[in-house]
């Protein structure tokens, strides 16, 4: 019986103080030049720029965007 009361108190306390939602990390604003060079990721085809992380395949600059030069030309074959 005591366990039931304790569980009820804990549940009500959790409901009274809801958990904070995790906010995604802030990214720097992208410049127009970077946005104009935005190209699709070769793995998942989702368009992304140098400032962001691909949501689909989780790749970053070293695995995906390193293939694009500063003019936005595909360097890998």
Curated annotation (Swiss-Prot):
Contains 5 disulfide bonds. Keywords: Disulfide bond, Secreted, Signal, Toxin. It comes from Conus marmoreus. Transmembrane segments: none annotated. The lineage of its organism: Eukaryota, Metazoa, Spiralia, Lophotrochozoa, Mollusca. Residues 17-32 form a propeptide. It comes from the Eukaryota. It is found in: Secreted. This is Conotoxin Mr8.2. The keyword Hydrolase does not apply. Residues 1-16 form the signal peptide. Expressed by the venom duct. Belongs to the conotoxin B2 family. The keyword Magnesium does not apply. One of its GO terms (cellular component) is extracellular region. Its main location: secreted. The gene superfamily associated with this precursor was described as 'B superfamily' in PubMed:23152539, but this name was already assigned to the conantokin precursors, therefore the superfamily was renamed 'B2 superfamily'. GO terms for molecular function: toxin activity. The cysteine framework is VIII (C-C-C-C-C-C-C-C-C-C).
């Amino acid at each position: 019986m005591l366990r039931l009361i304790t569980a009820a108190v804990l549940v009500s306390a959790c409901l009274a103080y809801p958990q904070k939602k995790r906010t995604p990390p802030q990214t720097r604003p992208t410049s127009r030049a970077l946005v104009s060079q935005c190209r699709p990721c070769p793995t998942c085809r989702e368009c992304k720029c140098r400032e962001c992380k691909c949501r689909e395949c989780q790749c970053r600059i070293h695995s995906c965007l390193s293939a694009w030069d500063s003019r936005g030309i595909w360097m890998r074959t």
